[in-house]
Amino acid sequence: MKVEHRIGVQAPASVVWDIVYDLDRWPEWNPLYTRVAGAIRYGGTIKLQLALPGQAERELVATVIDWSPNEAVHWKTSLLAGLVRTIRYLEIEAMGETGCIFSNGEIFRGLLGPRIARQLRSSLRAGFEALGEAVRDRAEAHWRAQGGGATLDAR
């Protein structure tokens, strides 16, 4: 089972990537992950404080399984002795030189994965939406500050 949020960003994919890749600054703007430690590198461990709306915050330990500059980072988690396995992703799809789509979501696997996903679906969607909006707002502000084109406010 997959839960995902996608949002258009009026800034280049490289600007979005710079924000996603800079884990040290996530606590400044990221409503979903309020603390983070680690680095984006193959096989690297990332410790995350997950703050889903309507849920108690909890710490997750994830392993980076894939990343590609300006495009994506994927990590995996395993809970309940492997009964819940997830792949979490942040992906950037360039839509020209000054725009992109930012997607973030989670794929649930394992014996209890789909059940947990159904239980948390509304909180996950709200959290992923908040993260997407925060990435968009920060990227567009950075792009404007760098002299990038004005954004259209179609929200």
Predicted features, each with a name:
Residues 1, 77, 116-120:
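Residue-level detector of alpha-helix boundaries and kinks
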Residues 1-41, 155:
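Hydrophobic ligand-binding cavity/cleft-lining segments
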Residues 7, 55, 126:
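A short glycine-/small-residue-rich loop at the edge of a beta-strand within enzyme catalytic domains
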Residues 27-28, 37, 53-101, 107-112, ...:
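Hydrophobic-ligand binding "helix-grip"
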Residues 42-47:
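Short coil-to-beta transition motif at edge beta-strands of beta-rich domains
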Residues 107-155:
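A conserved amphipathic terminal alpha-helix motif
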